[in-house]
From Swiss-Prot:
PROSITE patterns: RECA_1, RECA_2, RECA_3. One of its GO terms (biological process) is DNA recombination. NCBIfam families: tigrfam_recA. This is Protein RecA. Belongs to the RecA family. InterPro entries: AAA+_ATPase, DNA_recomb/repair_RecA, DNA_recomb/repair_RecA_CS, P-loop_NTPase, RecA-like_C, RecA-like_N, RecA_ATP-bd, RecA_C_sf.
Length: 350
């Protein structure tokens, strides 16, 4: 078959497919990508937005946040909810753990009057509610807190001590098969918060694993491993908050395995001012001499906490530093892309 005949045959096949399944059921990848640019929601931590490579968590995809207890999983998810609301979006929170604190959510910046919340009795109900909300096309982000608390109905109806092998994993696998396509069509971001467990009898390698089987690992576009790495000490004997480290364990949209560090303060959540200060020092925008921090010819203050408070008060300086950090990050991305192009050109053609 020559080229014109092949082209006619392909056009006939495409016309038949569109007649059978509807317009837009098949198209070139170029047209598809032009109409499906990835929209994101900021996480509240600039260092994490940059580590994710796309400026936040993607809409239309599944995101998993996992880690040990008291590591900041719910705080991070609530910040994403608050940022989605600030963009004019609608957020829903499926609280399977029955542990969401409205006061803390409000303190972080979430509008609790507009935040939809569901506390379902079983895992099947929780996942069905998530799918129906996504199918509506009116919700921007859905948080499921947590996978470990999604108890299958048959387990609830049984007695404590009964063995239910693989029930939760089967439930998750079945639900995610339906949910993935619905999320992509409605451009809804689904955030699954997950806990970690330890495998028994693992002598070599990492014994840690997450609950709910393997399906969530496969269907997630981004997986974030969040850990507490230290305490932020106050002037007295009490702690101000925790220092957090996030590793991007999986990323389908940018290079994975990047890490980000930021502060979670007990009275305000993620410290955006602390993030800006750390990144400004890292990129040599702000100079650190001993305990003093200098920006251009100006002394910002002595001690990290004092400068962080100054950035919280001075919105103009905060925005200026943030813009410079974004400019440097964008420039480094362009350089990396150009270097890759040159490298590919230099390779001999087989």
């Amino acid at each position: 078959m020559n080229v014109p005949d092949r082209k006619k045959a392909l056009e006939a096949a495409i016309a038949y497919i569109e007649k059978q399944f509807g317009a837009g059921s098949i198209m070139s990848l170029g047209k598809h990508s032009a109409t499906h640019e990835i929209s994101t929601i900021k996480t509240g931590a600039l260092s994490l937005d940059l580590a994710l490579g796309i400026g936040g968590v993607p809409k239309g995809r599944i995101v998993e946040i996992f880690g040990p207890e008291s590591s900041g999983k719910t705080t991070l998810a609530t910040h994403i909810v608050a940022n989605a609301q600030k963009m004019g979006g609608v957020a829903a929170y499926i609280d399977a753990e029955h542990a969401l604190d409205p006061g803390y959510a409000s303190l972080i910046g979430a509008n609790i009057n507009d935040l939809m919340i569901s506390q379902p009795d079983c895992g099947e109900d929780a996942l069905s509610i998530a799918e129906l909300l996504a199918r509506s096309g009116a919700v921007d982000v859905i948080v499921i807190d947590s996978v470990a608390a999604l108890v299958p109905k048959s387990e609830l109806e049984g007695d404590i001590g009964d063995v239910h092998v693989g029930l939760q994993a089967r439930m998750m696998s079945q639900a995610l098969r339906k949910l993935t396509a619905t999320l992509a069509r409605s451009q809804t971001c689904a955030i699954f918060i997950n806990q970690i467990r330890e495998k028994i009898g693992v002598s070599f390698g990492n014994p840690e694993t997450t609950t709910g089987g393997r399906a969530l690992k496969f269907y997630s576009s981004i997986r974030m491993d969040i850990r507490r790495i230290g305490a932020i000490k106050g002037n007295e004997s009490f702690d101000l908050g925790n220092r957090i480290k996030v590793k991007v364990a999986k990323n389908k949209l940018a290079p994975p395995f990047r890490t980000a560090e930021f502060d979670i303060l007990f009275n305000e959540g993620i410290s955006s001012a602390g993030c800006i200060l750390d990144l400004a020092v890292e990129h040599n925008i702000v100079e650190k001499k001993g305990s003093w921090f200098n920006y251009q010819d100006r002394k910002l203050g002595q001690g990290r906490e004092a400068v962080r408070e100054e950035l919280k008060k001075n919105k103009k300086l905060f925005d200026e530093l943030e813009k410079r950090i974004y400019d440097i990050s964008s420039a480094s991305k362009v350089v990396a892309v150009e270097e890759k192009k040159e490298e590919l050109k230099a390779q001999p053609v087989a």
